[in-house]
Amino acid sequence: MGTLGNERAGATVLPFQASFEREMRVLLDLVRTRGLDRLPVVRQRLAKAWSGLRILQLNNDRLLTAVLQGVHPGPESSIGKLYWANWHRDFGELMMDLLGADALVAADQEPMAEMRHSFLNSRAETIYGGANEIQRNILGERALGLPK
């Protein structure tokens, strides 16, 4: 667990975080272009996604600060991995909901192709780097002291 815990302790999340921020900006631009930003339910869902992204950023900052101070990350790194994988999966679903069929059929048109790729990849993120179930087991055993 030590190696995997250190792997997830912030630095590996940075490229993902930057990618998520870019995806959020692109989605907001597309939503505005289509006039969907006038719909209260869309604004609410986007606000929830943006808030979740901000939580991810703050958690990552906290983990990186701890590592830079020489503190060995504990189960917090599993919380971070579990959170970002689930956030991105949910964000991928939001992208597809808002962009509709265009995101699936605009095969080579940017940014739709990038959004589709991100959606499909977001499913794999809940598996690689430690499946969500494994992360929950780590949290249960190490953070909550539950038996194996």
Predicted regions and their residues:
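C-terminal helix-coil-helix/basic helical segment that borders enzyme active sites and/or dimer interfaces
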Residues: 32, 36-43, 54-107
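Predominant activation on well-ordered alpha-helical scaffold segments within soluble catalytic domains
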Residues: 21-28, 47, 61, 85, ...
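Hydrophobic packing residues in well-ordered alpha-helices of helical domains and bundles
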Residues: 20, 46, 77-80, 115
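Glycine-rich beta->alpha junctions and the first turn(s) of the following alpha-helix
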Residues: 1-56, 125, 141
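Glycine-rich phosphate/cofactor-binding loops in nucleotide/flavin-utilizing enzymes
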Residues: 1-14, 99-148
